[in-house]
Amino acid sequence: NMATCATQHLANFLDRSRNNLGTIFSPTKVGS
């Protein structure tokens, strides 16, 4: 249960990081 919650938070964090940082550094990696 704890691992699932942590995984969802991590996935959400990575998703926002891709949207924000990914667009700045390399937009091509956003699709990966």
UniProtKB/Swiss-Prot annotation:
The keyword Secreted applies. GO terms for molecular function: hormone activity; receptor ligand activity. It comes from Sus scrofa (Pig). The gene is IAPP. Pfam families: Calc_CGRP_IAPP. Can form homodimers. Interacts with IDE and INS. Interaction with INS inhibits homodimerization and fibril formation. GO terms for cellular component: extracellular region. Belongs to the calcitonin family. Its main location: secreted. This is Islet amyloid polypeptide.
